[in-house]
Amino acid sequence: MYRVVYYTDKRGDSPVEDFIRSLQLKARAKVLKWLELLEEYGPDLPRPYSDSLRDKIRELRISHSKLEVRVLYFFWKDKIIVLTNGYFKKERRTD
């Protein structure tokens, strides 16, 4: 099993944790459920839940209602997943 940790800067702020807390209750619950899946499956979590971006950065892909939520993360040391930030995807990629 993997362990999810939230990136925290020198001041103790965690942008990704703040982002997740800012979501509406149902969207937040879905993100937390996807994080449980990520802890269980790690790098084997398939699409549509997770996808590789570049330079070992991955994204957790959550669709809720009309929202497309993304949480970026990477694997660090032995079975640690570091969540770095979150955002709303606005458009489909065209390339």
Regions found by a protein language model. Give the residues of each.
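Basic, Lys/Arg-enriched alpha-helical interface segments
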Residues: 1-68, 77-81, 88-95
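Portal/gating segments that form or line small-molecule/metal binding sites
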Residues: 71
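Conserved Hanks-type protein kinase catalytic core
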Residues: 74
